[in-house]
Amino acid sequence: MPGSLPLNAEACWPKDVGIVALEIYFPSQYVDQAELEKYDGVAAGKYTIGLGQAKMGFCTDREDINSLCMTVVQNLMERNNLSYDCIGRLEVGTETIIDKSKSVKTNLMQLFEESGNTDIEGIDTTNACYGGTAAVFNAVNWIESSSWDGRYALVVAGDIAVYATGNARPTGGVGAVALLIGPNAPLIFERGLRGTHMQHAYDFYKPDMLSEYPIVDGKLSIQCYLSALDRCYSVYCKKIRAQWQKEGNDKDFTLNDFGFMIFHSPYCKLVQKSLARMLLNDFLNDQNRDKNSIYSGLEAFGDVKLEDTYFDRDVEKAFMKASSELFSQKTKASLLVSNQNGNMYTSSVYGSLASVLAQYSPQQLAGKRIGVFSYGSGLAATLYSLKVTQDATPGSALDKITASLCDLKSRLDSRTGVAPDVFAENMKLREDTHHLVNYIPQGSIDSLFEGTWYLVRVDEKHRRTYARRPTPNDDTLDEGVGLVHSNIATEHIPSPAKKVPRLPATAAEPEAAVISNGEH
């Protein structure tokens, strides 16, 4: 039959394609949400309890989407002792657009110039917070295709989430995640198990090319998110049940079949409501619900229709209570980065994954299924799953990826808190200057984490020059390398063999390496 899969196709696929390594980056400063409540003159608990947020990371004008992605990529390469020529595909998922033509990926190619590796597929992928997941799927599809040349794929998801003054501002944040994709991975993409929903909606969008701020319909955005979750979960359940039936297992899939369930997290409270939403789906689909103790006390909701429940407080309250233990077991740990740093848009759901890996041992993770719900306004959404390898022995791939993230909490704790008025001043500075030419950023370089790339200047042709805050190991820098616009061939890129310390520098810093996006 035309278009059908050959019977022996699976034998040709690389084994256990998945996430081999993961690196996360967030800036060195945050604002406390409780202090922000006082500054904004809102009721105590509106941000901390109502949204579930404790702190919100932000960056000064010294960092932009290019520098965020450069930082997380170089950190991943260095910490995993990877050669730049082992990457065959590099794709960026972002909705932080600073150029309508030139991709972030092309800026990242500056990091590869010393290696001579230019044979790297992939560009940028954009649809609100979904771009990172689309890039991940493209990477997996490349490795499982005839185009694969045996090298790794590298996916970068990063964003700067900023909002105008008002109710949405405390749901901001900033960060980037880099994912190394390849075969024989500790976190394996379960083949054939993706439930996707695509729909036209104006829930959140950015039509103003001169502003970083979105237009948000808050109520519609929540409805779209939960509706997409309903549909994606339904499709996923049908697909995994079909797989199970082929294996002789005739049972329905439920939340209990996920070891962990992580979500795109605009704010933590929505994630808690989303897990409750999945339990509501299980409840309505269970023909024997009266025999399941988890549904005790929910009998009155047996005839509700999903589409009528998005803003039903009684349903929400009842199922949040019923799912509280499941939330603690399967989802709460995933909210570490979201609670402490805020919404990272495309990288948000992968920050949730990093949070889980950072807080559980390889033995606790081994063999578990991790459900992943990715959502981007407009809208695009997918629920898929990762299967954790069974091999949790010392030195295993699973041991290495968890070890690389074991300091995540200490890194979050090492950041510097700033007063809300300083945060507001930085937001106003971004608003006034993000589009300027002939601009030299005003933000402090000293406050950045070691190993952080930062913006040096924007010239009269909108060309951006970057430098990297050195680490104590950067002893190979040429004397006199200044902060000037220059060709990459004359500049130093720290060796991939060097390690990046996680905590901020305390000693006086040496001169910084400089990199630019070229004289074109």
Swiss-Prot record:
Disulfide bonds: none
CDD domains reported in the protein's UniProt record: init_cond_enzymes (cd00827)
Region (Disordered) location: 492-520
Domain of life: Eukaryota
Phosphothreonine found at: 476
Database matches in SUPFAM superfamilies: Thiolase-like (SSF53901)
Keyword flag Cell membrane: no
PTM sites of type N6-acetyllysine: 46, 273
Keywords: Acetylation, Cholesterol biosynthesis, Cholesterol metabolism, Cytoplasm, Lipid biosynthesis, Lipid metabolism, Phosphoprotein, Steroid biosynthesis, Steroid metabolism, Sterol biosynthesis, Sterol metabolism, Transferase
Entry's localization field: Cytoplasm
Catalytic residue positions: 95, 129, 264
Pfam families reported in the protein's UniProt record: HMG_CoA_synt_C (PF08540), HMG_CoA_synt_N (PF01154)
GO BP terms in the entry: acetyl-CoA metabolic process; cholesterol biosynthetic process; farnesyl diphosphate biosynthetic process, mevalonate pathway
Enzyme class: transferase
Keyword Lipid biosynthesis part of the UniProt annotation: yes
Catalysed transformations (reactions): acetoacetyl-CoA + acetyl-CoA + H2O = (3S)-3-hydroxy-3-methylglutaryl-CoA + CoA + H(+)
Subunit description: Homodimer.
Family the entry assigns: Belongs to the thiolase-like superfamily. HMG-CoA synthase family.
Protein name stated in the entry: Hydroxymethylglutaryl-CoA synthase, cytoplasmic
Organism, scientific name: Pongo abelii (Sumatran orangutan)
Gene this chain is encoded by: HMGCS1
